[in-house]
Amino acid sequence: MSYDVRYLINKGYSGDFGIERSFNITAVELVKRKIIAIDSERISLVQGPPGTGKTTVFQQVINECLDETDENEVFLYVAPTNKLVADMLARVASIYRNQEKTLEDLKKEVRVYGSRFRYGGEFEHLRKPIDDDVKIVLSTEYQRIYESEAARRYHLLIDEASKSPIHRPFITISDRLLELIQQSEKEGILESLNVIGDPKQAIALGDEYRGREDLLLLTNLIRGLLSEKLKMEVDRGEIDITEAAFQELRGTFYEFLEVTRRLPHPSETPISVGFYGGNLRAYKKADEILKEVANQWDTNEARELSNLNDDYFKTVDILNSAITTGVPIIYVHVRGDYLRDYLFNERRAKVGLLFSCAIKKILKENVTIVAPYVDQQLQMKLRMHHLYGDVLGEDIKAINFTTIHRMLGAEDSHIIAILGKERTGRLYHERTIYFMEPEVFNVQLSRHKKLLVIVGDLFKLRREAKKMYEYLSGEEPRSFQESSLKLKVKQLEMTTEQILELANISSYNTLRRVPSVSSGDGCLFFRWE
């Protein structure tokens, strides 16, 4: 996909990208202190869980500090994808509009570097080298900046650094750094270093980085700023590295964005307790959100679907119960293991497709099926067209299919989360998706704005996580990787436990005596036979 620079700038000049500043005020003030030199230490680290508006922090900082920096200082925004750079360009255009700056001002003061931008003749100037007039540079991690005249000093704004290795965001200024080293210059080009990300969403890492938080930029910087005592506790697996930052660095080097505007309460509780030490809270309440959803309920469509067969009848009944009682999570227990070398579960596919059909037909709202594996995603998409095309008609095009890794950074009104293999695997190389990267579970549970439907076996996932944690606790960690994995597995267990607690079934160790239907304050449980 390519991005039209003209369209993005016009979008910024015609629309408003701001959110209420009060939600991120502490993070914005922390970064501002580093930029305008109130603090002598010029590093700020911001952790932003799902839906907390990470990128808007940098937007607000640029807006408030643009006229407070001197003529040699430049804001250098670096992001891992062209999409993020494109989004920030529209936000910068919005800033220029709000400050009553003209389009000519923007052309003169902004540079945009990426591999998928169409500049056209009018905006060709935005890809030229940096000169004395430039104030803002937006770039992907793999571009290199070039200065045509006087050397500049940069406020480095690194966005979505959740899974960025230590070196990658600095590729952009690597030529200038090398030049200074060769010239033995003492004057640095980095005026401040500001990093935003979330280690708890660091997924899809390469083998050399998986489980190695010490090789990732954000966690490495946190670790370097910790006291020796806390650093040793982190290395021994006694405390999570972000929890250590929350305790010791908050307000000086680190801030935590604690309000999610995406997830309706209490559906944020599982990941808050499991991955964020109970510090994440939701701005919106599920009962208020689902009242609006209930008003969209099409009774005729619901009746027609229910009359098709027993499976549709059950699906519509469960969906209606959750919406009318204001419960944002539906946990449909579906056993049935994945075969050893086959990443498709037919029973879970069937249930996921039934719920997506019901949501689309009855509510007329967007729904995305989030699968753990590409095989599961593709097979479900094929079955949707083959088995449910007659039911959905043209609506079939509006149901999205994706994997957890592709859903990172995205959201939808309703999410169907198909669980992957819940067993651990005997050997390290056999370890399954949730035990290789427990953060995957966090991402899968945090994409919805209204309803989350979980299809799988949470009892088994909890049991296996507990078993693995006990095993790792009995061994002396031989590396930072092992101590880190132990804590992550515990977070996986706690998250699963919290979902079961929201459905009032956490006290059951196995499924044997669990009622076929159970509902609590935040989750409706149904055993699919």
Placement of each model-derived feature along the sequence:
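N-terminal accessory nucleic-acid engagement/regulatory domains that precede
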Residues: 1-6, 521, 525
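Conserved P-loop NTPase motor core of helicases/translocases
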Residues: 4-20, 63, 68-156, 160, ...
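Conserved pre-motif I regulatory segment
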Residues: 12-45
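Hydrophobic positions on the alpha1 helix immediately C-terminal to the Walker A/P-loop
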Residues: 57-61
